[in-house]
């Protein structure tokens, strides 16, 4: 594996650890801005699933594999598919299973990724592979922080956080 891909993969492993720790600790039922925390978590997981590799060549498997309807990832009432119902709580087990599926998919993707194709756009996609990866780093960590704050408000404790000192 080329050095740049290895470094991206290494940083993603840290992100995976932070995401998993958040799912394990999250208060899933707490409502913030009309949505419960489980929906925010599912939103960023679904985004990683769809946008990390190629959103234009994507098929959602989460409903078939884990029983999670795709529209539950929509957390903005202005977007198509939005369902306002804060009583729909996605279980921790389903979130962890879906996370494991995404993690495996991304780890397999890293095995085929090269420095050269990081700067290329996949078929029918308007962004380079590197842009999509960086966008998901930003998006997932923003939402992991939001979920951590929601959980802090109810439990009065912060979840673990891993950074470069993880190694």
Task: Put a short name on every predicted segment.
Residues 1, 5-29:
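N-terminal leader/capping segments at the start of a protein or of a new domain
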Residues 8-19, 47, 91, 95-109, ...:
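Alpha-helical packing segments of well-folded alpha/beta enzyme cores
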Residues 9, 13, 28-78, 123-167:
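Short, contiguous alpha-helical
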Residues 17, 28, 49, 104, ...:
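Generic structural signal for secondary-structure transition and capping sites
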Residues 25, 43, 112:
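Conserved catalytic core of Hanks-type protein kinase domains
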Residues 77-120, 131-136:
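Acidic/histidine-rich alpha-helical segments that form the ligand environment
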